[in-house]
Amino acid sequence: YTSLTYFSGFHGENSNFVVTMTESAVWADGRYFVQAEKEIAGTEIQLMRMGEPGVPTAEEYCGKVLPEGGTLGLCGLTANCALVNNLKKELEPKHGSIKTLFLEDELWVEGRPARPATPAWILPKEYAGFSPAEKLEQLRAKLKEQGCTAQLVGKLDNLAWLLNLRAMDIECTPYAMAYCYVTPDRAVLFIDQARVTPEAKAELEANGVTLADYDSILDGMAAETEPQTVLAESATVNYAVYQVLENNPALTVKDAADPLLAMKGVKNEVELAHLRESHLRDAVAMVRFQIELENRLASGEEL
């Protein structure tokens, strides 16, 4: 967690950091060009301004700097499978390989912040419109249409919608760091169990969801013996988990679009009603602000 910031000093988002034996580079998008320049000033790190002409992607850069027959190490828990697939294509001309490493666990021992574990709770059905059990049945029907019997959900916003699960692991975003494995008759939520409120645990169990430890995801999926065709979207499932799924002989992995994306986009009547109410409240707040602003300006107040 936050290992990119620890090694590079850069505090932005949507970034990659590459280190070779002789050089290093960090990627930043347009929101962070100025910040990144300041934070890496005085170091050997090159700033790669994403989207600028002539600036290679992290994948292209790795393909260029990796020596013939070289090995690229990466943390498979923080790199999605689609990124790794792109890396493999770039490394192929040099017969390069990829290896999952967890070097930050060895190098960053002291002072490392804990993984976010804000209280996890369940959004009531009166706001969500459907219970977790109802949404799980809807998902299973969609999976059947796509020729699958199971799914590994790794995208946090999709998981939040599926189980009505809420937390504050990401500032200003109500997500909980977790995974969910859904089969025709089971749903397993991999999450730090101590953070789940008693009410949320009871609600999940009542809706057919069992809890497992967050860190047991790799061992848990490796231990699955029930044959399943598992939908796992490479763009939203990390490489380490995807590898475990592919290496389990009981599981057939299908890389396809996550049906939850479209499902959560279709708002039910309860959600629509709350959206309308929210827009009305926003409108009232905006009008009050404009009136206050105009009155202060009219009185000659300097703002």
What are these language model-derived features?
Residues 1-67, 75, 79-222, 280, ...:
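N-terminal accessory/capping or targeting/presequence segment of soluble
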Residues 153-156, 233, 258-259, 287-291:
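Short coil/turn segments at secondary-structure boundaries
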Residues 156-161, 235-238, 292, 303:
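A glycine-rich phosphate-binding loop feature that marks nucleotide/adenosyl-phosphate handling sites
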Residues 116-119, 226, 230, 274:
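Short, surface-exposed secondary-structure junctions/capping segments
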Residues 263-303:
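Long, K/E/R/D-enriched contiguous segments that form extended
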Residues 62, 70, 74, 200-259, ...:
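Conserved catalytic alpha/beta cores of large enzymes that bind or transform nucleotide phosphates
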Residues 39-41, 66-68, 252-257, 267-269, ...:
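Short acidic (Asp/Glu) and glycine-rich catalytic loops that position anionic groups and cofactors
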Residues 86-114, 237-274:
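Terminal amphipathic helices with adjacent charged low-complexity linkers/tails
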